[in-house]
């Protein structure tokens, strides 16, 4: 019989940081899990906008953003790994060269062609751009979950793309029927 850890797959789930999260990097975050397997896990923080918008970022990478309503869209802190690199989470299209398909209809793309398409008015209809990602080695995430570091729930793309970033934490908890004020940082306490 397989161990319980062998059966867990958090791909297309939200990780919701518990109040007692020991790592301040992830305090108050919601992480969308793009990949989780026996080698480890990769996700993107979806509720931590940084002080840069798409127009500014596109200028830095020599792209002219033709769609003005997108110019003020926030760029997000995706996690502490490779923070100089962009990761685009978007509705699945199958059109870009370096994309990871995620069950549930989303893709994570790391190639510049998706940004070029967005700059020219094409590209995915719904997307968020993060700098960096959250990564865990084999067994690390499972250990954090067992120590009450994270709650998990099936992801809802509407929260990623249509809920304001400051409301995504509460919206993700609401998927579990939890009011954020009712959480305790200690296991076994309400």
UniProtKB/Swiss-Prot annotation:
Coiled coil: none
Source domain of life: Bacteria
Pfam family, one: DUF179
Signal peptide: none
GO cellular component, one term: cytosol
Family from the record: Belongs to the UPF0301 (AlgH) family.
Protein name in the entry: UPF0301 protein Rpic_0619
Organism of provenance: Ralstonia pickettii (strain 12J)
């Amino acid at each position: 019989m397989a161990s319980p850890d062998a059966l867990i797959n958090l791909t297309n789930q939200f990780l919701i940081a518990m109040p007692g999260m020991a790592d301040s990097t992830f305090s108050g975050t919601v992480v969308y899990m793009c990949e989780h397997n026996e080698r480890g896990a990769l996700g993107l923080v979806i509720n931590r906008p940084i002080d840069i918008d798409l127009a500014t970022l596109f200028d830095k990478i020599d792209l002219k953003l033709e769609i003005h309503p997108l110019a003020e869209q926030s760029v997000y802190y995706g996690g502490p790994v490779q923070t100089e690199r962009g990761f685009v989470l978007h509705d699945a299209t199958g059109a870009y060269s370096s994309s990871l398909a995620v069950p549930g209809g989303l893709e994570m793309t790391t190639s510049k062609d998706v940004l070029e398409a967005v700059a020219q008015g094409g590209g995915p209809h719904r997307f968020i751009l993060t700098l960096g990602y959250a990564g865990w080695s084999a067994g690390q995430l499972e250990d954090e979950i067992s120590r009450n570091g994270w709650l998990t729930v099936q992801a809802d793309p509407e929260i990623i793309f249509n809920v304001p970033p400051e409301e995504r934490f509460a919206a993700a908890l609401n998927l579990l029927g939890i009011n954020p004020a009712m959480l305790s940082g200690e296991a076994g306490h309400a």
